[in-house]
Amino acid sequence: MSLNRVIDAKIDKDNPRTAGRAIPAGLISKVETLAFILFSFALLFVSAFQLNMLAVYLLPLAVFFLVFYSYTKRFTWLCHVFLGLTIGIAPLGGWVGATGTLQLEAYLLFFAVAFWTAGFDVIYATQDADYDRGAGLHSIPSRFGIRKALMFAKAFHILSFSLLLWLFAASTLGWVFLVGVLIAGAIMVYEHSLVSADDLSKVNVAFFTMNGVISIVMLIFTIGDLLI
């Protein structure tokens, strides 16, 4: 996130919605932010070498996505998917770190998180559709319009929910996890009911609050399933 803020500092400054972010507002300098980024990358490298060789081999791929995704909105409306893949690396990396393997369940979790993230990022990007279009930036809302963008978001979330169901079927996780998935799916449905092409006033509730709740629900029910 810090790297994204540095890379997008000029864009954030020019966009009225994001001009108040820390770097364009002068609350923190690029040098200070870059120092934090370098420390974070160093910690990532040290951590990977403390785990297993698969984690070490995959480390360059993780770094590539962490750097590359911030540039994607400059040339493709699939930037939301690249962000999703980048965020999806987190649970995939956790799996590799814990097991030293890559199995079907890991890929299902990876893509479930990727499409969930892509979906809510599309919803969030509806706020900047006009600015992005004028600035020559790419996004699904700026390319296809708000109404179709929300359809993309729904499709991404249907894919995510389906992959979570597949993960349940393919793994040893039990009914507690399944209940968590069903609750998460219901929250996704509610999330989409909060926004429409005619009313984006609740975008922040849909983006921040609902997805925060989904994260907590999945964490609690997954841990609960493993403990029971």
Task: Please tell me what each predicted stretch does.
Residues 1-11:
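Juxtamembrane transmembrane-helix boundary signature
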Residues 4, 120, 186-189:
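Alpha-helical transmembrane segments of polytopic integral membrane proteins
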Residues 11, 54, 72, 76, ...:
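Juxtamembrane transmembrane-helix termini
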Residues 159, 166-228:
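Extended hydrophobic alpha-helices typical of membrane-associated regions
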